[in-house]
Every structure is written in C-alpha cells, then in structure tokens.
C-alpha cells in the first residue's frame, strides 16, 4: 500500500532535542519536544508514580514531535500559559511499522496539530496547601478516515513518502487537571475527552475518562500510591499494548475501569527519581465487545520495575 501513515524501522532516533531561549517573562523553544498536555503526560516518565500512565492518557497523547512552543517563564506565576504547533508525522521512506521516533521528512503535507494550556495557582484556596488547576486543549488539522486493517490513517493524496503518525489520538483533546499536595500527601485528579478518535471504525467517535490518584510518602524512601481510572466511549477505548493487553482479548471496548495499588522505593533520598523500585497490582474490568464480538480484558495484572534517570 502506498501513501499511508507508515515508515521504516531504524535503530537510532532522537527522543528530545531542542533549543530554548528565555526572553524575560516568555520562554521560546524549538526542536523535538514532548507536547505536555494532560497531567500524567506532563509529568516526566522518570517521575511518574505508577509503572504506566492511565490508559486514556496514552490513547490521546502524542509522541515527541518537532515543533515550536512558547510559555510563561516563571512556573510560580498565578496564571500560567503555553502554546505550541507540532508536526504530525516523523519518518523517511520505507515500509516498516515499529519505530515511532524516526526523524522527520519535512513536508508541509505532513500537516500539524496545535496545543494550548492555561493553569491557575489555587494554593490555599482549596483543602490542600499547594495546588494548581490546568486546562489543556489540542486540535489536529490532519484529515483521516477509517482504515480497519492498519487501525487508521487513510491515504494522503499526493503524498510522496510514507510516514509514521505521531500526533494526538483524537482530532480534539480536552483535559482538566487539578494537582495538589500538603506535607507528604499528594493528589491528582483529571477528567479528559477525545472527540473524533482516530484509528477506529465508524461509530467510535468519542471517548471520555477520569483519573483520581492520591499518594503518600511514608518515609523519604517509601511511598504508597492508589489510582482509579475510567474510560468510556462506544467501542472507542483502546487498551494498553505493553502490560494488560493480551492477544486473546479485544484491543477495544466500550468502558474500562481499573484500580491500581502500588508502592515505590526511592534508593537515593537526595535525588529520588534517579533510581527507584516500583511494584504495582491492578484490577481492570471492561464492558462491551468489538465488531467481531470479542470482549476486552478483565482481570489482574502484577508488575515490578526498576527505573533509573541520570
């Protein structure tokens, strides 16, 4: 097939590489950057409290992309903001399907998406001493259609090379996040939605979800975390591919709910995220069947991880 969102598999890639200039109250950045929308995705992978982010966050987020971003320089501003424009496809010629971090072939027909964020400091205004409210929005300008065989990304007319799709999981993504902490206790709550979800058959247009994640630092080394997540949308919820998803179950469902219990051990008190051991147990339940009458996964998953950052 020609002119599809597809690319060759290479053994090298850049995850992030950018130039940043702080011009007083405004900071400018250009290069390959992670578009930071939704609370869990805004958090670095080295600092997340669970072994994997929530399912709907992973479904709606984009990969790192080449783009341009501006934002307020001081993270302590009462009102914060950010805006960016990003490429949708990275890649060169080829026919492979695995690597999604290939460097870009710059072409205006690659199309793009935009992101915007507003945040407001709610510290001392609610029940936690330090807190912030975030509103994220992303809009994707790419035109796509239904393609059940390779899960989306209709042929692009006149497109001279293939490219792996890197953009958002829906044409429009909205997320409202509130994060707060007081002492050793932290809480993150998030509601999000994706409108016109890509890669699904007709009728699976929209998806909605909520995440609630409290955590508590018992000692400088030991931390406990609980997460409840729910995602719903008519045959539009995409399951994880790395952990809970099993080939004997459908990759989509109408509704998913999951409860995660985890414990993290930080090896170095002075730099907690430099090296840590994470253990988590999660029960997930799905409702509905896909077009082939296959059910999604319902059951337990157990994971242990050693994560480093240096």
Regions from the language model: what does each represent?
Residues 1-91, 110-125, 210-236:
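Outer membrane beta-barrel
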Residues 6, 127-310:
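Outer-membrane beta-barrel pore domains
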Residues 44, 51, 55-58, 95, ...:
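Short alpha-helical interface elements
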Residues 57, 105, 165:
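Charge-dense, low-complexity intrinsically disordered segments
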Residues 88-150:
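Loop-centered beta-sheet repeat module
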């Amino acid at each position: 097939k020609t002119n599809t969102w597809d690319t060759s598999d290479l053994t090298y890639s850049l995850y992030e590489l950018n130039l940043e200039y702080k011009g007083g109250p405004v900071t400018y950045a250009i290069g390959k950057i992670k578009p930071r929308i939704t609370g869990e995705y805004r958090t670095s992978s080295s600092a997340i409290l669970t072994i994997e982010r929530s399912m709907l966050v992973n479904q709606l987020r984009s990969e790192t992309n080449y783009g341009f971003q501006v934002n307020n320089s001081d993270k302590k501003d009462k009102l914060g903001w950010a805006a960016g424009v990003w490429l949708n496809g990275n890649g060169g010629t080829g026919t492979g399907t695995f690597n999604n971090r290939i460097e870009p072939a710059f072409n205006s027909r690659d199309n793009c998406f935009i992101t915007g964020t507003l945040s407001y400091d709610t510290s001392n205004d609610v029940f936690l001493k330090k807190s912030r409210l975030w509103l994220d929005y992303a809009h994707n300008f790419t035109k796509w259609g239904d393609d059940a065989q390779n899960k989306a990304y209709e042929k692009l007319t006149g497109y001279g090379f293939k490219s792996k799709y890197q953009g958002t999981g829906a044409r429009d993504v909205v997320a409202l996040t509130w994060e707060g902490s007081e002492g050793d206790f932290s809480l993150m709550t998030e509601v999000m939605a994706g409108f016109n979800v890509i890669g699904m058959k007709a009728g699976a247009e929209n998806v909605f979800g909520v995440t609630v994640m409290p955590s508590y630092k018992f000692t400088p080394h030991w931390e406990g975390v609980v997460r409840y997540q729910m995602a719903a949308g008519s045959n539009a919820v995409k399951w994880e591919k790395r952990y809970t998803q099993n080939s004997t179950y459908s990759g989509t469902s109408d509704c998913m709910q999951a409860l995660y219990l985890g414990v993290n051990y930080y090896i170095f008190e002075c730099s907690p995220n430099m090296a840590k051991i994470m253990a988590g147990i999660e029960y997930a339940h799905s409702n509905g069947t896909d077009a082939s009458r296959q059910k999604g996964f319902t059951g337990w998953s157990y994971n242990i991880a050693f994560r480093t950052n240096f």
